[in-house]
């Protein structure tokens, strides 16, 4: 491949890129204009294995709403919740028609974590960082921001400023009618029926 040469002319506001016989001159902006995420104290700092976070977000993101008027549903609600085995790290997403709720064991240090709504776009970008099964992700959470840090990349995002609805009210309680089905058989049956469904 060709050797790429970058030359910055801050006075003229130009960046020259040269590679082989190609030459590009790009307009630039002053570095002072780049938005800076102000450093702040995080209420909670903990580490979670990449596979755990991957499972939480992969199994909940399909239910994120795309309706902009209900902006508080445009993300995944990440919080600490009471579960059967004690406290759990929980992801919840809903679009008003579907609801996904996924639990994982609460990581050490996460007990005081405030509940936050992680935006849909942040979930998508975070997912790209979670493919390494051996990686530990450092998570820092405040009322306004969330940060995910790997050894090579740090992703910081504002959280959605809103109140996630009380999803527990729409989950049936005390239901005595329960059944277990083979997941692959059930998926195939739903797939066949879906071909003639208009909704």
What are these regions (language model features)?
Residues 1-199:
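Structural preference for solvent-exposed beta-strand-turn elements
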């Amino acid at each position: 491949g060709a050797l790429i040469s970058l030359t910055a002319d801050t006075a003229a506001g130009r960046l020259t890129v040269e590679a082989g016989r190609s030459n590009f001159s790009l307009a630039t902006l002053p570095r002072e204009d780049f938005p800076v995420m102000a450093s702040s104290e995080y209420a909670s700092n903990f580490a979670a294995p990449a596979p755990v976070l991957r499972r939480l977000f992969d199994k909940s993101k399909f239910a994120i709403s795309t309706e902009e008027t209900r902006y508080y549903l445009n993300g995944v609600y990440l919080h600490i919740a009471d579960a059967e085995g004690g406290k759990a790290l929980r992801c919840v997403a809903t679009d008003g028609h579907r609801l996904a709720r996924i639990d994982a064991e609460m990581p050490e240090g996460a007990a005081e974590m405030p509940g936050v709504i992680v935006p849909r776009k942040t979930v998508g970008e975070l997912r790209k960082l979670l493919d390494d099964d051996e990686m530990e992700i450092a998570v820092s959470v405040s009322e306004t921001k969330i940060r995910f840090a790997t050894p090579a990349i740090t992703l910081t995002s504002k959280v959605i400023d809103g109140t996630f609805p009380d999803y527990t009210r729409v989950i049936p309680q005390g239901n005595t009618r329960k059944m277990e089905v083979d997941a692959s058989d059930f998926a195939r049956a739903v797939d066949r029926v879906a071909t003639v469904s208009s909704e």
